[in-house]
């Protein structure tokens, strides 16, 4: 059976997840955000940035609540970073 890839939804200092749209640029923004935080990969899932292999030291949620504050990813690069 396929092993679950560990990951989570990163949150800012107010414990807000990062909102995103299901556009290519936002998938890239989420990936760049995740890599900046020490994760290996990231994408937009249910309008929320999700990171794979996010270090335990990074504040994160394991699931999305129905009512949640959303942090913006405006300012995160939307092009592939080296």
UniProtKB/Swiss-Prot annotation:
CDD domains attached to this UniProt entry: neurotoxins_LC_scorpion (cd23106)
InterPro entries registered for this protein in UniProt: LCN-type_CS_alpha_beta_dom, Scorpion_toxin-like, Scorpion_toxin-like_sf, Scorpion_toxinL, Scorpion_toxinL/defensin
Subcellular localization, as worded in the UniProt entry: Secreted
Entry GO MF terms: sodium channel inhibitor activity; toxin activity
Every LCN-type CS-alpha/beta domain range: 6-70
Swiss-Prot/TrEMBL GO biological process terms: defense response
Tissues with expression: Expressed by the venom gland.
Entry GO CC: extracellular region
The keyword Manganese is assigned to this record: no
Keyword Metal-binding: no
Keywords: Disulfide bond, Ion channel impairing toxin, Neurotoxin, Secreted, Toxin, Voltage-gated sodium channel impairing toxin
Disulfide bonds: 16-69, 20-44, 30-49, 34-51
UniProt comment concerning the protein's domains: Has the structural arrangement of an alpha-helix connected to antiparallel beta-sheets by disulfide bonds (CS-alpha/beta).
Role this protein plays: Probable sodium channel inhibitor.
Annotated family: Belongs to the long (4 C-C) scorpion toxin superfamily. Sodium channel inhibitor family.
Additional comment: Negative results: has no effect on Nav1.8/SCN10A sodium channel from the grasshopper mouse, a species pain-resistant to C.sculpturatus venom.
Protein's name in the database: Toxin NaTx-13
Species the sequence originates in: Centruroides sculpturatus
Source lineage: Eukaryota, Metazoa, Ecdysozoa, Arthropoda, Chelicerata
